[in-house]
Curated annotation (Swiss-Prot):
It is found in: Bacterial flagellum basal body. GO terms for molecular function: cyclic-di-GMP binding. Monomer. Interacts with the flagellar basal bodies. It comes from Cupriavidus taiwanensis (strain DSM 17343 / BCRC 17206 / CCUG 44338 / CIP 107171 / LMG 19424 / R1). Belongs to the YcgR family. This is Flagellar brake protein YcgR. One of its GO terms (biological process) is bacterial-type flagellum-dependent cell motility. Transmembrane segments: none annotated.
Length: 269
């Protein structure tokens, strides 16, 4: 047990149905969760830079989550990138509600992982096209694309059976509870089946988030959501959020370092 838990709190997280099942995939275990804050350091706005990332996503056959303005979601992948005309082609959606929502939405948010690093961008209304004799969508390049840098610190994964939880109180008094997936000195990875990007859009800053590591201690600090991605499909999908700590003080960083070490020992144990 760590001897100096910071900011003790007795308030438990809201009663979600236990910890999410340990249905990790390679994408989940490699997911980046402690990228730096979502600011201009990670924003790409030149077409050549955006095109390079889109081509990499296509080359790596990365799966991307798409969320329309009406909150419909589906999973797709980029099939082709045209840097001259600044357009890209992505895979068709067979589900009619999601497809119709996409084609009538002027704001469609893409999120995914490129070599374990979160990528986020928003495009306008796409059009139907053909690619390799099959239906597909074509859209213009986004005006900006966020490509987060790799983590600066070692990340310790948690054991799902431990039930470590994060509780967030939003400005509208909504209280969200998520499972803690991993921890580093600069951020934390959270996951949930019920908390979605509608509740925690990328860029959201939440004050006084409570991290409960049970016998290891409890923390309270400010965090910013810097990444979101889905693992799985339909009802089995798990929402993952990468959150960066906002200005932790020296004493907090010292405790985080010991906590990361303790989590890694438990994970290897």
């Amino acid at each position: 047990m760590l001897r100096e838990p910071m900011n003790q709190h007795d308030a438990p997280g809201p009663a979600e149905t236990g910890a999410d099942s340990d249905a990790e995939t390679d994408a989940e275990t490699d997911a980046e969760t402690d990228a730096g804050a979502a600011d201009d350091r990670y924003r790409l706005s030149h077409n050549s830079q955006i095109g390079t990332v889109l081509r990499d996503l296509a080359w790596q056959k990365c799966m991307l989550s798409v969320r329309t303005r009406t909150a419909h979601q589906f999973v797709t992948s980029i099939l082709h990138v045209d840097p001259v005309n600044r357009t890209f082609v992505f895979d068709w959606c067979n589900a009619e509600p999601e497809r119709m929502s996409l084609m009538t939405s002027e704001e469609n948010a893409f999120s995914g992982l490129l070599r374990g690093v979160p990528v986020n961008f928003v495009v306008g209304q796409p059009a139907a096209t053909r690619y390799d004799d099959g239906p597909a969508f074509v859209a213009e390049f986004p005006e900006k694309l966020y490509h987060f840098q790799r983590r600066r610190h070692f990340r310790a994964r948690t054991l799902v059976t431990k039930g470590y939880r994060c509780e967030m109180s939003l400005p509208d008094k909504t209280v969200l509870g998520l499972d803690i997936a991993d921890l580093s000195l600069s951020g934390v990875g959270l996951r949930s089946r019920t908390v979605t990007a509608d509740h925690l859009p990328v860029g959201t800053t939440v004050a006084k988030c409570r991290l409960d590591f049970r016998e290891l201690g409890k923390l309270e600090l400010d965090m910013q959501v810097v990444g979101h991605w889905l693992v799985g499909r339909d009802d089995s999908a798990i929402h993952h959020f990468g959150c960066a700590f906002v200005n932790p003080d020296g004493r907090m960083e010292n405790f985080l370092q010991r906590l990361v070490f303790a989590l890694e020992l438990a994970h290897r144990g």
